[in-house]
A protein has these predicted regions:
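Catalytic domains of carbohydrate-active enzymes, especially glycoside hydrolases
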Residues: 21-45, 69, 289
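Alpha-amylase-like alpha-glycosidases and glucanotransferases acting on alpha-linked glucans and related
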Residues: 1-5, 9-15, 47-53, 58-85, ...
Length: 289
């Protein structure tokens, strides 16, 4: 490893990726630059303009280019006797449902295999929930305006949707959601899966949920049943808001009005940015995983 003599920082973004940086190497070498200091290159939130809101620290950011293009950049630097300094952002990640680790924590709470990654004080909430200051108004107003809805797609199954954000459901709430509506006969496959979800580990629950999503896509009887169950939570349906409140009570997170929620937040943030969650970098196991 050579000691840096002259460093030039580059800011990656969707409009400036690995190929663009590689083209600059000969020019920067001619200026006497010894090292590039690069902004984060790992997978970040969609359309991130800075890359510090990392969602997967084990994958390159697809918006910046391919692995082959990244290797070409590194090869170009080496060919010119230059080095690369990477900002790996070890101290925080995106508190976003686009982040699989954070999403797992939302779905499974302290039982998530990723719960130890983040500095969360579960005991600070009376019900042991992760407190999320993400709503544009108190939750009762949000429910009255029908802005929080239960939705489903063929890729990820049922979820709570607040505008463009989708929040995962706990295994216990899947069971509530899929209880047989009045007059409906629950398919045996759904009944078996619901039973499997009640006491499942996060890993087992993920498999059951994947099977259920596949059945929703491929089995017309399962699809029809789940659609009827979802209709009981739809805006305008009698008792729908009360059912949504019951569903919210079963989650491992508490959705809060952002103006007041920040006063009782129970996870460490990056400075005062609520959508960047602090990573427990003092624990080597976080980086081993």
């Amino acid at each position: 490893m050579t000691s840096p003599l002259a460093i030039y920082r580059i800011q990656f973004r969707p409009s400036f990726g690995f190929v663009d940086a590689a083209r600059l190497v000969p020019y920067l070498h001619g200026l006497g630059i010894s090292h590039l200091y690069a902004s984060p290159v790992f997978q970040a939130r969609a359309c991130s303009e800075h890359g510090y809101d990392i969602t997967d620290p084990n994958s390159l950011n697809r918006q910046l280019g391919t692995e082959a293009e990244f290797r070409e950049l590194v090869g170009m630097l080496h060919a010119h006797g230059m080095g690369l300094i990477l900002d790996i952002v070890p101290n925080h990640q995106a508190a976003s449902t686009q982040n699989p680790a954070w999403r797992s924590v939302l779905e499974h709470g302290p039982a998530s295999p990723f719960a130890a990654w983040f500095d969360i004080d579960w005991g600070a909430d009376p019900d042991g929930k992760l407190r999320l200051p993400v709503l544009g108004a108190p939750v009762d107003e949000i429910l009255e305006r029908d802005e929080l809805r239960l939705d489903i797609d063929e890729g990820s199954g049922p979820h709570l949707r607040y505008f463009d954000t989708r929040y995962p459901l706990s295994s216990a709430s899947w069971a509530l959601l899929l209880e047989a509506p009045a007059g409906a006969s629950r398919p045996a496959l759904v009944a078996a899966m619901v039973a499997g979800l009640r006491e499942a580990t996060p890993e087992a629950a993920l498999r059951v949920e994947s099977d259920l999503v596949r059945a929703y896509r491929d089995d017309e009887h399962v699809r029809a049943y789940i659609d009827v169950a979802l209709d009981h939570f739809a805006p305008g349906t009698t008792g729908a808001r009360a059912r949504l409140r019951d569903l919210l009570a079963l989650q491992h997170y508490r959705l809060l009005y952002w103006r007041t929620g920040v006063e009782t937040i129970n996870y460490r943030r990056f400075f005062d940015i609520s959508d960047l969650a602090g990573v427990r970098q003092e624990d080597p196991r976080v980086f081993d995983e």
